[in-house]
Amino acid sequence: MYQPPTGVRDLLPLDVSQKLWIEQRLQRVFTRWGYQRIITPTLERMETLQASGSVDLQAILQLRDAEGVSLGLRPDPTPSLARAVATRLADAPLPVRLSYQMNVFRSTTQPQEFYQAGVELIGAGGVLADAEVLLVLAECLAELAPPDWTLILGAVAFTRSWLAQVAEPARHRLRRAMAELDRVAILAEAGIDEAVRSQLLLLFDLRGEPEMVLSKASSLPMSDAQRAELAELETLTGWLRGRSVPVVLDLSLVEAFDYYTGLIFEVSAGGRLIGRGGRYDHLLGSYGKPAPGAGFALNLEALQQVLLPTGKLPGRTVGGGFLVVPDGPDAWEAALAEADKLRCAPGERVEIELLGRTGEEAIAHGRALGAAVVRWVHPDGSTTDCDLAVIQ
């Protein structure tokens, strides 16, 4: 009782301090590359979320407003940003570079709320735009330095072309099996051509060093469009490896959201999936403004978990500053004036002792707060300092 609903949690001061540490570093990278921050509503009309037909309605937490309009909590930032660009930024010069830090909500077996940060590059297509998005992501990861991070690239059109040979609903089941790397489900699926089954199983082996994967893939029967997509992957991996970005190819990679049209990618670190993204050239057309787009989202909770063992994150809430202690009831006005004066320094943190602690109790409390100095203020305005760094 009196706990948050299953799937959501309180962020306590230390959680917030660590989250802010991550967000600030990501925002610095976003700004350096010219991405401007945008904040979209947490609630969207269901028709907005449904417009592309690519978001699973079962994943959306739905409600109605007082007028009976069906609303949904955003399950993904990208459709909301696409809607904003197609409407509020319709006349903006292209390409539009946007960044965000926001919470998203998904309903699977239980509601979930989590935080994401990412960028969207809208109005530019092709391999150069894909490269920019990947390089922004790589710079974010270099800034944070999570352990053993790897960028995993895939080609959604290449993979879908094999699935397109299978009719629904078997196609949906096979797509899910590929997303979950479930070979058994593919073997068990009845009523599909054995040659197609063999090709789908072969895709599981098309993962690893780019040269090896591209060599194996070149032996498959492919359309010109598929060969062009693999050629772009070869170009991208060459550029990334030239910048010492750890990258592998995975031609079995598929994503939960069905709006991706070309490049797709994931990033893992410390054995966890910490981000994903890709190209979505048809999404903005769903909102009346056709334009290519690409972007990525990093999961802030996952980043926090992989960074914790590294010791990079703050181990305590923001420390330093002053604990101002009035030396008796007659010193209150002088203590308030002293605290006001201290707060004039940029970024200074000042707390006032409110519970009458004195002497060693005040020192112990200051240490618990992480204060640098306990300052007693006397009725005449004079002060006495205890430097906690000296006495520890």
Curated annotation (Swiss-Prot):
Q: Which SUPFAM superfamilies match?
A: Class II aaRS and biotin synthetases (SSF55681)
Molecular function as annotated in GO:
histidine-tRNA ligase activity
Q: Which keywords appear in this protein's UniProt record, sorted alphabetically? A: Amino-acid biosynthesis, Cytoplasm, Histidine biosynthesis
Where is it mostly found?
cytoplasm
In the UniProt record, does the keyword Amino-acid biosynthesis occur?
yes
Subcellular location as annotated? Cytoplasm
Species of origin reads Gloeobacter violaceus (strain ATCC 29082 / PCC 7421)
Q: Which Pfam families match?
A: tRNA-synt_His
Annotated gene: hisZ
Q: Which pathway is recorded for this entry?
A: Amino-acid biosynthesis; L-histidine biosynthesis; L-histidine from 5-phospho-alpha-D-ribose 1-diphosphate: step 1/9
Which family, according to the similarity comment? Belongs to the class-II aminoacyl-tRNA synthetase family. HisZ subfamily.
Q: List, alphabetically, the GO terms of the cellular component aspect.
A: cytoplasm
* Chain's role: Required for the first step of histidine biosynthesis. May allow the feedback regulation of ATP phosphoribosyltransferase activity by histidine.
Name recorded for this polypeptide: ATP phosphoribosyltransferase regulatory subunit
TM region(s), chain numbering: none
Q: How does it assemble?
A: Heteromultimer composed of HisG and HisZ subunits.
Q: What else is known?
A: This function is generally fulfilled by the C-terminal part of HisG, which is missing in some bacteria such as this one.
Q: Name the GO terms of the biological process aspect.
A: histidyl-tRNA aminoacylation; L-histidine biosynthetic process
